[in-house]
């Protein structure tokens, strides 16, 4: 499996885990908004750190060197769609955005 697909799988898995944590906190925390904001901050920092890694940078180079770039792009698009579906379903603020409503991914 391509390094790029491994990375996309990792992002989707991480997002699913974050969504689960947010959902659990919503039901068990008295100060839900603070907890959710803290998890969003952590998730954002993790994504920024991930984008700065050599592994990610090398995966972009791998995409450019692939003979079947369209197939790789379609695989990545599929993973991003999964990621968006998870985010639209788990994040109430995101559910109300045009992105989630127009794509109907939140249902």
Curated annotation (Swiss-Prot):
It is a single-pass membrane protein. Keywords: Host membrane, Membrane, Transmembrane, Transmembrane helix. GO terms for cellular component: host cell membrane; membrane. Coiled coil: none annotated. It is found in: Host membrane. Residues 1-4 are cytoplasmic. Residues 26-107 are extracellular. The chain crosses the membrane at residues 5-25. This is Uncharacterized protein ORF107a. It comes from Acidianus filamentous virus 2 (isolate Italy/Pozzuoli).
